[in-house]
Amino acid sequence: MKILITGRPGVGKTTLIKKLSCLLQNAGGFYTEEIRESGKRIGFKIVTLDGEEGILARTDLPFPYRVGKYYVNLKDLEEIGVRSLEGALREKNLIIVDEIGKMELLSSKFREVVEKIFDSEKDVIATIKKSSDPFVERIKSRDGVVVFELNEKNRDSLLKEILYVLKFNRGENNDTGAD
């Protein structure tokens, strides 16, 4: 099953992904976290589910690529993020990707591994930007992809809903609640 989580920035997509990755077994991949100094966001780091970390983007390190005020570090994205996705594709049952967004899409290696992941039989939970980007739209419109929009009203219930849908699809819970 392929699950995409979308929503406005700051609504809690990464928090939801982190909770799901803790609750679900045999998962691999990565999520992103803010880097803050003096209460201000100055960048993002990549954190793999097995604990490896790298810099995705910062405002104060002049990497060659830029998205808004952030300089994007494709080296760490590819050596840490993409490598974790490739490993998860080989060895895990569930692949976590946070996120399929503007910064990550600068990397052709990232786009390639995302295509492989969505072509695979593996379960996937990914966050994805709201966008008219052709790559993003192609991923969202694939057969078998379920898109959940996270917002303030459903952020407490969506965790349970995603767990239920994933487990039901795996055949782990065939009780629909209907008598």
Curated annotation (Swiss-Prot):
Belongs to the THEP1 NTPase family. It holds the Pfam family NTPase_1. The lineage of its organism: Bacteria, Thermotogati, Thermotogota, Thermotogae, Thermotogales. PANTHER family: CANCER-RELATED NUCLEOSIDE-TRIPHOSPHATASE. It catalyses: a ribonucleoside 5'-triphosphate + H2O = a ribonucleoside 5'-diphosphate + phosphate + H(+). Signal peptide: none annotated. This is Nucleoside-triphosphatase THEP1. GO terms for molecular function: ATP binding; ATP hydrolysis activity.
